[in-house]
Amino acid sequence: MKNNESASAAADAQRIEEVTRMAEAIFQSNDMALNWMRRENIALGNAKPIELCDTDEGAAKVRRVLSAIEHGNSV
């Protein structure tokens, strides 16, 4: 059980890191990216992006919103 938990925690950390790096590139600021990751987001059903990164599906939703922001599209 402990190995599964540590593998899950590692996967969560990796997803958060990847999405945060994407946000940093888009916002061109570490502080702005972290702020965005920690705030409720209407486009994500008022969820905090960082909380959605606990699953692959949630991280994909966050990436889609970031991509829309990057390309100036509505979400």
Which residue ranges define each predicted feature?
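Non-transmembrane "mature" sequence context
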Residues: 1-75
